Amino acid sequence: MREGPWTGRYPAAAAMVICALVPYLALSAALQPITPIIAGDLHMSLQAMSLASGMANAGYAVGTVLAVLLAQHLPQRRMLVIYAALLVVGSVLAAAAPDAGFFIAGHVLQGLCTSLLLIAAVPALVVAFSISKLRWTAMILNVCIFGAVALGPLVGGIQAQADGWRPLFWIIAGIAAAALVLSLMTFQDAPPADPSATRNPLPVGLAAAGCVALFYGASELLTHSFLDAVTIVPLAGGLALIVVLLVYQYRAKRPLLCIRPLGSTLPVSGIVVAMCAAASSISAVALAAVLLTNQFTPVHLGLLQFPEFIAALITAVLLGLVFRTRGLHYLVLGGMLSLIAGILVLQSQLPPTSLLMALGSGLVGLGVGGSVAPALFIAGFSLRNNALQRVFAIIELLRGVAAFAVGPVLAHVARTVGGSPAAGTHTALWICFGIASAGTLFAVSLYALGGVRPPAPALETWQSGEAPAWYSPPLLARIRDSSRATVLTEPLACDAGGHYGGPRNGDSAEPAADRAGAAT
């Protein structure tokens, strides 16, 4: 196939990623104020709307695994164009939906295609351009994922104030169409990543069954108790299937996902931080906002949450400044502390005042923007860059489960615990505080017990594919007296086909590890 006229141009490729990721992520956060309007127009119950959102989130989580499998055996850039086209189809179906069935199908397709595009496009943007562009990619990723979510409440509030919903969905469809056009303009044919890789569909099946069950159970919490069979059985069963997927991929000789190489100090710390920050941040702001829905107009309430978006922009700039330094690790720590502070501000007075709501959402925005994206790169830099797609897939699967499944559970706690919504929200916010604090303490403890002095990433080494950007010690290295151990991060690297093995070109493990350590 012919190359697009903008092939190799970073601004066009970055714009394509932005247009691909922003629609669904912003829409998922904008739905709350317009949900009653959509339900009334399409003759849906609020429970049906909850189920639609849950299945769309399940599609987002499953797509991360499906994208990796398809990338191994099908031309990657051609698949990216197909994903973008399907995103347009889903967006148009949702925007023009005459009834509930079309809306649910379109919205689920939006969630699925967004994660397919994330896994197909973002790793290529990271490794296909020069190192000088890498910090810009990190900043763009931060704004796309977290800035879009933070902007959602204001966008939804503006649309709710106009007493409609279709204009917003048509705008989303237009942005998706721009992503499709840009994917064609930047097209450069790329072969499958590894046709000899496993074709086993079981990992995708486990992910699909687990996510659908988990998000179905979470969505049913709107009208059922937590211990009702229709909620607790799919919740527990879905979570169990996801655990089975992780264990199965860890033990597999030819895995689809790189689980075993992530089992050292820095990747585990990064993944735990990303999950805890995602689970606590989205829920905290949304829970506090619910208490103010009867006091303010949707636009006013959206403006009170707008500081979260400003904070996401600030943390994107900070990420760019520290990206090549050891400050990357300290940015994550500072982000988690800011997140904890924001949760405490929100729960200090319920319902919160306008000042407390704005201040709390700003601190939460600083927290999630300063922790999740940097933590993803901390995990990714711990492996060779050829494993980046697989690393992003497993991290986004876990982050998506944490962000979208915990929220309905905490919302159920806020509605049912205590004698009033304020009392229930107070309890739910303390749970958010506990999640964020536990994740922070766990990560700091792993650094201490692993004997880690935060390193600066050796980006040249990582970009060349020779070795990880730094050496990540085994878990609990100090307790296990790993100063004499021979287990190194580098031999655990995952090649393009998902095989585990030592350094390339027949090099021994020791020189490869030394090279990575010397570069940092």
Could you describe each region identified by the protein language model?
Residues 68, 95-102, 184-187, 218-224, ...:
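Transmembrane helix-loop junctions and nearby membrane-interface residues
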Residues 1-9, 446-520:
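Intrinsic disorder in cytosolic terminal tails and internal cytosolic loops
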Residues 3-17, 200-202:
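N-terminal membrane topogenic signal
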Residues 157, 161-272:
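Hydrophobic transmembrane-helix bundles of small-molecule transporters
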Residues 10-27, 31-42, 46-56, 65-68, ...:
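12-transmembrane solute porter fold
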Residues 32, 119, 140, 145-157, ...:
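Glycine/proline-centered helix-kink
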Residues 57-60, 64-201:
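Helix-loop-helix hairpins in multi-pass membrane proteins, especially solute transporters
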